[in-house]
Amino acid sequence: MSLSPHQKTAGGLVLVVAVMGAASFAAVPFYNWFCRVTGFAGTTAVATEAPAEVLDRTVKVRFDASREAGMPWEFRPLQREMKLKIGETGLAFYEAYNPTDRTVAGTASYNVTPDAAGGYFAKIACFCFTEQVLAPGERVEMPVTFYVDPAIIDDPDGRYVRQITLSYTFHETALTEEQAALAAESATDVN
């Protein structure tokens, strides 16, 4: 059985649409993986411990904080910058405050600039790894433990980095049913 030219064209178009649809679904996970592996777009690395090697060269790390439109929290770094040696572990704190009369959950997205530093800026522990839930009027200090990987000096672009900015943006997230129930329970008058 032979296909007519119209049937071949239609079959080819269906195949193209199917491949494009599959590629669009795979694009987001692939991009996220690519950014984690390469540090592209300022994506930081996650580490379990600091490196054994600490270099004499220092780098200035600046801290930035912002909120997504509609996020009611106040959010700020408790220090604006710090200098540390490459390979040395740093500890910085951010503060979040919920001025509302309701429990609010949020997650922090983050990035590092310049982009060349992203793959070498490693976090050991960070509030951004988990969702944060603040009760009405609650204020918390949230730590981030990090280091700059000594391998940065071997990178053709990274070796010129003298200042790195770590930026966080907090986004409001929906409370889980359990969190919402606890929030409602704590808001109920017990008299």
UniProtKB/Swiss-Prot annotation:
Any one biological process term the GO annotation gives: respiratory chain complex IV assembly
Which intervals lie on the Cytoplasmic side per UniProt? Answer: 1-9
Q: Which residues lie on this side of the membrane: Periplasmic?
A: 31-191
The parts of the chain that form a coiled coil are none
Going by the UniProt record, its keywords in alphabetical order are: Cell inner membrane, Cell membrane, Copper, Membrane, Signal-anchor, Transmembrane, Transmembrane helix
Q: Where in the cell is it found?
A: Cell inner membrane
Domain of life of the source: Bacteria
Membrane topology value: Single-pass type II membrane protein
Pfam families assigned: CtaG_Cox11
Q: Which Gene3D superfamilies match?
A: Ctag/Cox11 (2.60.370.10)
Against InterPro entries, the record matches this protein to: CtaG/Cox11_dom_sf (IPR023471), Cyt_c_oxidase_assmbl_CtaG (IPR007533)
* One GO term describing the cellular component: plasma membrane
Example GO molecular function: copper ion binding
Q: Does the keyword Membrane apply?
A: yes
Bilayer-crossing residues are 10-30
Matching NCBIfam families: PRK05089.1 (NF003465)
Q: Which family does it belong to?
A: Belongs to the COX11/CtaG family.
Please describe what this protein does.
Exerts its effect at some terminal stage of cytochrome c oxidase synthesis, probably by being involved in the insertion of the copper B into subunit I.
**Full protein name:** Cytochrome c oxidase assembly protein CtaG
* Species of provenance: Cereibacter sphaeroides (strain ATCC 17023 / DSM 158 / JCM 6121 / CCUG 31486 / LMG 2827 / NBRC 12203 / NCIMB 8253 / ATH 2.4.1.) (Rhodobacter sphaeroides)
